[in-house]
Amino acid sequence: MPLFRNAQFEISIAKPSGLPPPNGAEIAFAGRSNAGKSSAINTLAGHVRLAYVSKTPGRTQLINFFRLNCGALLVDLPGYGYAAVPEKIRRQWQGLIETYLRTRESLIGLVLMMDSRHPMTDLDRQMIDWFAPSGKPIHVLLTKSDKLSRGPANATLLAVRAELTARYGDQVSVQLFSSLKKTGVEEVEKVVAGWLVPAAAEGEAPAGA
């Protein structure tokens, strides 16, 4: 069965003190508010409304946890960079996301969504800089790749990969992804599955996972 298929919503938290005790390896999904994060999660899960909970009023500020069949957790972080959000709320989001990324021991990797037409914004770089010191892997999905023709899409992939490799080496990997065309699904599943193998060996995954 595909890794993310049949994911089930488990819990939402609004502040670091609300984080549940570690109970399985966690894979964080992050991205700008318009980067197609919810669509990517829904496509990977094969569920058109799995990430809908994070779109409902009052939920957009939350970290949402979804349990996978393998026992690991998909962790949907609040979208960042939405201009209409009051500054106070943006600071709260920033504190919540930064604390989670920097301190969560059960977090084994970050999947970061960037719009392939506008990748590597200042906020994208900040997100990577928050997480990179952990030494844990980062996988970048260049979303909405169907909006670009093959030549520009591949050029963007090569440019982003070159920039990130120059700075972070093999800690960061990059791929094209399209929720509309469902392209890139197997690649991201393979990458994340590779993260889960050492995590299970170290006891991060629940017994029987």
UniProtKB/Swiss-Prot annotation:
Residues 23-198 form the EngB-type G domain. It holds the Pfam family MMR_HSR1. InterPro entries: G_ENGB_dom (IPR030393), GTP-bd (IPR006073), GTP-bd_ribosome_bio_YsxC (IPR019987), P-loop_NTPase (IPR027417). GTP binds at residues 31-38, 58-62, 76-79, 143-146, 177-179. Mg(2+) binds at residues 38, 60. GO terms for molecular function: GTP binding; metal ion binding. It comes from the Bacteria. GO terms for cellular component: cytosol. Keywords: Cell cycle, Cell division, GTP-binding, Magnesium, Metal-binding, Nucleotide-binding, Septation. Its cofactor is Mg(2+). GO terms for biological process: division septum assembly. Belongs to the TRAFAC class TrmE-Era-EngA-EngB-Septin-like GTPase superfamily. EngB GTPase family. This is Probable GTP-binding protein EngB. It comes from Azoarcus sp. (strain BH72). The lineage of its organism: Bacteria, Pseudomonadati, Pseudomonadota, Betaproteobacteria, Rhodocyclales.
